[in-house]
Regions:
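Cytosolic, low-complexity regulatory segments enriched in Ser/Pro/Gly with interspersed Lys/Arg
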Residues: 1-11
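Extracellular trypsin-like serine protease catalytic domains
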Residues: 9-17, 31-35, 140-243
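Conserved H-D interstitial segment of serine endopeptidase catalytic domains
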Residues: 11, 51-54, 58-104, 158, ...
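Extracellular/periplasmic catalytic domains that process cell-envelope and extracellular macromolecules
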Residues: 23-27, 45, 66-68, 104-107, ...
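A short, Trp-centered hydrophobic/proline-enriched beta-strand micro-motif
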Residues: 24-36, 75
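Conserved hydrophobic/aromatic beta-strand scaffold that supports enzyme active sites
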Residues: 31, 50-52, 88, 111-113, ...
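A conserved glycine-rich beta-strand in the N-terminal activation segment of trypsin-fold
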Residues: 31-48, 106-107
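Active-site substrate-binding loop(s) of clan PA
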Residues: 61-63, 85, 97-103, 119-152, ...
Length: 243
């Protein structure tokens, strides 16, 4: 099982960031691994008690990959997910709040909040990502990060440029909504694969994207598609405030 749904038939995927390299250790302190015996999804810490991820990971909940919500372990402060390094905090999830407009067919509003069963301890290894002050513009270089579902076991990072709405639409005609942004290289070779789903795309130090979908890995003219976080600020803030 992968934290992945593509709106068209998925091509075979490698489940890792393609063309990336190992992040400097603990350089992405907001990075979360959602763990159920293996890293099945990424996420982003927003506060002591809340994590942002992709709504489509709930397909795992109903498909039986995860027998109940409390089975999801939220892993913070990780770098090598196979080795205890002394910086980790493992906290069970308490509840999932999927965006009410999420559409599993189109993947529109592919965004979800996860409340932790207890607050995380914030330190230099575990620190929330800032939400965006405004939407990011085309050409901005952003960083995506994740482990994928199988390999590698050390956190991978990759810098990708935000594409224009036109380039995004042309890559995926009639599949892009106003709540999606594309990033990556139209020539292929570098991309986030779906094992990294739900994880962060950081632009100028702010969380602008949630890894959502894309067709295969690093294919020519097929950039990665991300949920546009700046469209959801009021929902995120209201939901976190109401607990």
């Amino acid at each position: 099982g992968r934290c992945t749904v593509t709106s068209a038939a998925a091509l075979k995927e490698d489940n890792k960031i393609v063309g990336g390299s190992e992040c400097p250790k603990n350089s992405v302190p907001h990075q979360v691994s959602l763990f159920n015996g293996y890293n099945f999804c990424g996420g982003t810490l927003l506060s002591e008690e809340w994590v942002l991820s992709a709504a489509h990971l709930q397909n795992h909940l109903k498909d039986g990959y995860i027998s109940s919500r409390s089975d999801v372990e939220v892993r913070l402060g990780e770098h090598d997910i196979w080795e205890p390094e002394g910086t980790e905090q493992h906290i069970m999830s308490a509840k999932f709040i999927r965006h009410p407009d999420y559409n599993s067919r189109t993947q529109d509003s592919d965004i979800m909040l996860i409340k932790l069963s207890r607050p995380a301890t914030l330190n230099s290894y575990v620190r929330p990502a800032p939400l965006p002050s405004k939407c990011a513009s085309e050409g901005t270089m952003c960083q995506i990060s994740g482990w994928g579902t199988r390999f590698p076991h050390k956190l991978q990072c990759l810098d990708v440029p935000l594409l224009s709405d036109d380039a995004c639409f042309n890559s995926y005609p009639f599949q892009i909504t106003e709540n999606m942004i594309c990033a990556g290289y139209l020539e292929g070779g570098k991309d986030s694969c779906q094992g990294d789903s739900g994880g962060p795309m950081m632009c100028d130090g702010e969380l602008q994207g949630v890894v959502s979908w894309g067709h295969g890995c690093a294919l020519r003219k097929k950039p990665g598609v991300y949920t546009k976080v700046c469209n959801y600020l009021s929902w995120i803030e209201t939901t976190m405030a109401s607990g």
